[in-house]
Amino acid sequence: MFTYIKEIEEAWQIKDKLLQDSVKLSAFKKTLQDVIENLNKGTIRVCEKQNSSWQVNDWVKKAILLYFMTTESQLYNNNYNSWYDKVAPKFPFDAELNKFKEAGIRKVPGSFVRTGTYIAKNVVIMPSFINIGAYIDEGTMIDTWATIGSCAQIGKNCHISGGTGIGGVLEPLQAKPVIIEDNCFIGARSEIAEGVIVEEGAVVSMGVFIGASTKIVYRDSGEIIYGIVPACSVVVPGVLPNKEADKPGLYCAVIVKQVDKNTRAKVSINELLRS
């Protein structure tokens, strides 16, 4: 690992000259390919939780950006589509049955996963798009027309509902991607972006839009927070009224309740949202 970090950091310092040195570039491409393969395996991650805090491995982002910079686009095609891109699909079109059995996933027609993405066992991928650097942990469903942005981190046993957008980020290097922790539900057509963290067990209703500057309001106390959906919260869309009655209110996300983990495990999503 240290060797990768050292090579990536050194290459980053001379990235503008890298393409001019064919010998050095050829050797370095092997390092980049190794990093991409380790992203595929989940042994390297863009972002990791350390001591209860999420830390960005910015050298991995640099590796992905260098991969884009040093890779030539090529033509890809299958039986019904063609495209021209620098990033190969994670699952080749001629992939054999054993590859999917070994992965332990379910992947339906219309789904697209770029290489450099980790997909854990028992993940279900409906027709959706998962970008490079993303990490999808065990037992999660990525539902129809959901998009998972570059480097986004999705935990275990999550449901990312139909049409949901989970934002990613490659630049700035220090910025966190969107992080959805274990056992979360993100409702249909919601959008979580700009490095927001949805903590474990949270339930986000349909049609909720949360970015870094979105006000997240506790309904009971009126307290306003930003950038984090607290663990086991139930969140719905809302409006903060204007103090002046003739002026428009502003959109917000509202925490209508928080439940303990035992209740969250026993009670259905619909019950939480409707009660």
Swiss-Prot record:
Keywords on this record?
Answer: Acyltransferase, Amino-acid biosynthesis, Cytoplasm, Diaminopimelate biosynthesis, Lysine biosynthesis, Repeat, Transferase
Keyword Magnesium in record: no
Spell out the molecular function terms from Gene Ontology.
Answer: 2,3,4,5-tetrahydropyridine-2,6-dicarboxylate N-succinyltransferase activity
UniProt catalytic activity: (S)-2,3,4,5-tetrahydrodipicolinate + succinyl-CoA + H2O = (S)-2-succinylamino-6-oxoheptanedioate + CoA
What EC number(s) does its UniProt record assign?
Answer: 2.3.1.117
Kindly tell me the pathway this chain contributes to.
Amino-acid biosynthesis; L-lysine biosynthesis via DAP pathway; LL-2,6-diaminopimelate from (S)-tetrahydrodipicolinate (succinylase route): step 1/3
Q: Choose one Gene Ontology CC annotation of this protein and give it.
A: cytoplasm
Pfam families for the chain = Hexapep, Hexapep_2, THDPS_N_2
According to its UniProt entry, the protein's GO biological process terms are: diaminopimelate biosynthetic process; lysine biosynthetic process via diaminopimelate
Q: Which InterPro entries match?
A: DapD_Trfase_Hexpep_rpt_fam, Hexapep, THP_succinylTrfase_dom1, THP_succinylTrfase_N_sf, Trans_hexapeptide_repeat, Trimer_LpxA-like_sf
Q: Where does it reside?
A: Cytoplasm
Quote the record's binding site residues for substrate: R106, D143
Tree of life domain: Bacteria
The protein's assembly and partners: Homotrimer.
* Homology family: Belongs to the transferase hexapeptide repeat family.
Spell out the HAMAP family in the cross-references. Answer: DapD (MF_00811)
The protein, known as: 2,3,4,5-tetrahydropyridine-2,6-dicarboxylate N-succinyltransferase
Source species of the chain:
Rickettsia bellii (strain RML369-C)
